[in-house]
Design a protein with these regions (language model features):
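Pre-recognition alpha-helix immediately N-terminal to the DNA-recognition helix
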Residues: 17-24, 79
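A short, conserved structural fragment
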Residues: 53-63
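Key DNA-contact positions within bacterial/archaeal DNA-binding proteins
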Residues: 43
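Basic, amphipathic "hinge/linker" alpha-helix immediately C-terminal to the N-terminal HTH DNA-binding motif
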Residues: 65-84
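Amphipathic alpha-helical dimerization/coiled-coil segments
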Residues: 1-3, 79-90
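Short capping segments at the starts of secondary-structure elements
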Residues: 16, 26-33
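Short alpha-helical segments that sit at the start of domains
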Residues: 1-19
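Basic amphipathic alpha-helical segments that dock to polyanions
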Residues: 34, 49-55
Length: 90
């Protein structure tokens, strides 16, 4: 694991909302869908998705759309989600 990966993992682990929201991103999804699954408000979910995008954990595949934006985990995002899933199982 590279130093940058460790920093991103640590950043996600430190925040309960970040930890939980990354677990609900599966395939293509909208902020509304993720908010409904996670139980967090759309405002908080959108804010966290923006932070994830800046950190390179998710990618918005239609950024010019004002509504119905679709997000997908990047390789780094999947790596972090998988690490968190393994941690939960143990």
């Amino acid at each position: 694991m590279k130093g940058a990966d460790i920093k991103k993992l640590s950043w996600v682990v430190r925040g309960k909302q970040k930890r939980e929201i990354i677990m609900y991103i599966d395939g293509l999804d909208t902020p509304t869908g993720i908010a409904k699954k996670s139980g967090y408000s759309l405002n908080n979910t959108s804010r966290i998705l923006g932070e994830f995008r800046k950190k390179g954990l998710v990618k918005c595949i239609n950024p010019k759309e004002k509504t119905g934006r679709l997000y997908i985990l990047t390789g780094n995002g999947k790596f972090i989600r998988d690490k968190l899933k393994r941690k939960i199982k143990t």
